[in-house]
Regions:
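A structural signal for short hydrophobic beta-strand segments in well-ordered beta-sheet cores
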Residues: 89-91
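Generic C-terminus detector
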Residues: 199-229
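Conserved N-terminal catalytic core of the sugar/cofactor nucleotidyltransferase
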Residues: 1-49, 53-61, 169, 209-215, ...
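Catalytic-core segments of class I nucleotidyltransferases/pyrophosphorylases
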Residues: 46, 64-67, 96-196, 203, ...
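Conserved donor-nucleotide/metal-binding helix-loop-beta segment in metal-dependent transferases, i.e.
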Residues: 56-84
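Conserved beta-strand termini and adjacent loop/short-helix elements that scaffold enzyme active sites
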Residues: 21-23, 76, 156-158
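Short coil/turn connectors at secondary-structure junctions
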Residues: 14-17, 41-45, 50, 69-73, ...
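Short beta-strand segments
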Residues: 47-50, 76-79, 159
């Protein structure tokens, strides 16, 4: 955690605010909403898993639409060839989720639930009431089922041309590196350069970019930042 704080402290260099809360032991994903109750306040909230990689030309527009949710929850789905390895969802014609299953033995759908979730403010109270599973943690699938029970769970899709990669294993981590490297080398642009994103959104200016260049030192990333200004 200290390494993350050193790399991205409070977000001032990006024109945003960043806070850190540490989960002292594994208690499951929904526990994050309990720990972050004061931080969340009366707002709605999104959760993204740190080992998930998302890429797509239309992804930004989808995310901006997802954060507008005011009542209920929404998940991002992606079609996979091995649904038995993932939590999957079956949806109706209106993208309402009608069935959820974690690593189903029988085919339900090939729509895997990715590690990107959007919730209304009820998520904090719902998370507090979850009971741990056999492995001793509260489960994200149980939280989603709570919303589904109330008919408040919908979905959107990454869609064709988009990518979702899980970097939870060494093999998948290197596959993701190769994917990013291939696209960046071909296009000449960085994927998810946070300083570039902040600059394009006018959250920061040349002053902050120059500070980042000094922080990173003499490297290719600094050279890329120099070309932005």
């Amino acid at each position: 955690l200290n390494q993350y704080k050193k790399l991205i402290p409070n977000g001032n260099n990006l024109g945003i605010k960043i806070s850190y809360i540490e989960q002292d032991k594994p208690r499951g994903l929904p526990d994050a909403f309990v720990l972050g109750e004061k931080f969340i306040g009366k707002d709605n909230v999104a959760m993204i898993l740190g080992d998930n990689f998302f890429y797509g030309q239309n992804l930004t527009a989808k995310l901006l639409d997802c954060v507008k949710i005011r009542d209920g929850a929404k998940v991002l789905l992606h079609s996979v060839q091995t649904p038995e390895l993932f939590g999957v969802a079956k949806v109706d014609k209106n993208n309402k989720i009608i069935q959820l299953k974690e690593k189903p033995k029988k085919f339900i759908s090939n729509n895997a639930i990715t590690g990107l979730y959007f919730f209304d403010n009820k998520v904090v109270q719902y998370s507090k009431k979850l009971k741990p599973s056999k492995r001793g943690e509260v489960e994200i699938i149980d939280l989603l089922l709570r919303y589904k029970k109330n008919n408040k769970l919908s979905a959107d899709f990454i869609g064709r041309g988009g990518a979702w990669l899980d970097t939870g294993s060494i093999e998948d981590y290197y596959k993701t590196i190769a994917f990013v490297q291939a696209i960046e080398n071909r296009q000449g642009f960085k994927i998810a350069c946070i300083e570039e994103i902040a600059l394009n959104n006018k959250w920061i200016g040349k002053k902050e970019i120059n500070k980042s260049i000094k922080f990173y030192g003499n490297c290719n990333y600094s050279k890329y930042l120099k070309n932005l200004i």
